[in-house]
């Protein structure tokens, strides 16, 4: 694998997108629900606060902890994508490109939304 600036940028964007997909996106909620449960409580001011309760023990609890931590998930996503690049480079290149484009599109959308609100 050749490591250059473009590779680092593409991998970074791909890891960003994959980690957000796993930790935050609604489409992955059914997967996350296998490992943790979201609880809601009202605080003293009447605001609803959501917190996560990890399910199970052992591997299940480990995955639940992982999926509740964006930074932790990002490290594992980076490892997964680098391993894919080493083992199945052709398929990994397409996956990384797809995730990188989606990640950059998400960043652009956030910036444009904030810009339009001002």
From Swiss-Prot:
UniProt keyword list: Cell membrane, Membrane, Sporulation, Transmembrane, Transmembrane helix
Pfam families: DUF1360
Topology within the bilayer: Multi-pass membrane protein
Subcellular location as annotated: Cell membrane
One term under GO cellular component: plasma membrane
Chain segments annotated as transmembrane: 8-28, 62-82, 92-112
Acyltransferase found in the keyword field: no
Domain of life from the UniProt record: Bacteria
UniProt entry tagged with the keyword Transmembrane: yes
One record GO biological process: sporulation resulting in formation of a cellular spore
Family that this chain belongs to: Belongs to the UPF0713 family.
Function: Involved in sporulation.
This protein's name: Sporulation protein YjcA
Species annotation: Bacillus subtilis (strain 168)
Lineage: Bacteria, Bacillati, Bacillota, Bacilli, Bacillales
């Amino acid at each position: 694998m050749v490591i250059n600036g473009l590779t680092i940028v593409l991998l970074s964007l791909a890891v960003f997108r994959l980690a957000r997909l796993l930790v935050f996106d609604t489409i992955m909620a059914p997967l996350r629900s296998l490992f943790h449960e979201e609880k809601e409580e009202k605080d003293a001011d009447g605001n609803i606060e959501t917190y996560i309760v990890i399910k199970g023990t052992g591997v299940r609890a480990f995955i639940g902890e992982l999926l509740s931590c964006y930074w932790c998930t990002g490290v594992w996503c980076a490892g997964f994508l680098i391993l894919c690049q080493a083992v199945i480079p052709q398929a990994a290149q397409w996956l990384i490109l797809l995730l990188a484009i989606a990640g950059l599109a998400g960043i652009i959308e956030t910036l444009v939304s904030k810009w339009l609100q001002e």
